[in-house]
């Protein structure tokens, strides 16, 4: 935590001195975009970084005759819904819009489309990731 505090103390001095109070006006040419965003977020919340990650790691595994994604591990926003994830997978696999895609958590149940990935991660995540199986036909439950 002391390292985080040191980083937070160093970051505000550069953006405020160079660009005044308007952090959004910084361009990639004058300053890197990452320090202003972390400086704007970090001082208000001082919780452990492991519990409050904005993105979580999910592991996507194909089931049955569904095409396999070459990239299996993805970082996804906690607020993304299962339906948003289904739409992303369909687009990534270039599936026809009329084709169905089912998502299963731990090979046991299909979460509702409006369920947030962050909530599933908190309940069913293990080893720092959430394992989701996807398929074009119903497999479990």
From Swiss-Prot:
Bias (Low complexity) ranges: 23-40
Keyword Cytoplasm: yes
Major localization listed first in the record, in broad terms: cytoplasm
GO terms, biological process: autophagosome assembly; autophagy; macroautophagy; negative regulation of defense response to virus; negative regulation of innate immune response; negative regulation of type I interferon production; positive regulation of viral translation; regulation of autophagosome maturation
Pfam families hit by this protein: APG12 (PF04110)
Post-translational modification (record): Acetylated by EP300.
Expression across tissues: Ubiquitous.
Keywords: Acetylation, Autophagy, Cytoplasm, Isopeptide bond, Membrane, Ubl conjugation pathway
Record bears the keyword Membrane: yes
InterPro entries: Atg12, Ubiquitin-like_domsf
Membrane-related topology note: Peripheral membrane protein
CDD domains according to UniProt: Ubl_ATG12
Cross-linked residues, Glycyl lysine isopeptide (Gly-Lys) (interchain with K-? in acceptor protein): 141
Region (Disordered): 1-53
GO CC annotation, single: transferase complex
Location(s) in or outside the cell: Cytoplasm; Preautophagosomal structure membrane
Subunit details: Forms a conjugate with ATG5. Part of the minor complex composed of 4 sets of ATG12-ATG5 and ATG16L1 (400 kDa); this complex interacts with ATG3 leading to disruption of ATG7 interaction and promotion of ATG8-like proteins lipidation. Forms an 800-kDa complex composed of ATG12-ATG5 and ATG16L2. Interacts with DHX58/RIG-1, IFIH1/MDA5 and MAVS/IPS-1 in monomeric form as well as in ATG12-ATG5 conjugate. The interaction with MAVS is further enhanced upon vesicular stomatitis virus (VSV) infection.
The record's note on its domains: Shares weak sequence similarity with ubiquitin family, but contains an 'ubiquitin superfold' and the C-terminal Gly is required for isopeptide linkage.
Function: Ubiquitin-like protein involved in autophagy vesicles formation. Conjugation with ATG5 through a ubiquitin-like conjugating system involving also ATG7 as an E1-like activating enzyme and ATG10 as an E2-like conjugating enzyme, is essential for its function. The ATG12-ATG5 conjugate acts as an E3-like enzyme which is required for lipidation of ATG8 family proteins and their association to the vesicle membranes.
Listed PANTHER family: AUTOPHAGY PROTEIN 12, UBIQUITIN-LIKE PROTEIN ATG12
Family: Belongs to the ATG12 family.
Protein name (Swiss-Prot/TrEMBL): Ubiquitin-like protein ATG12
Organism listed in the record: Mus musculus
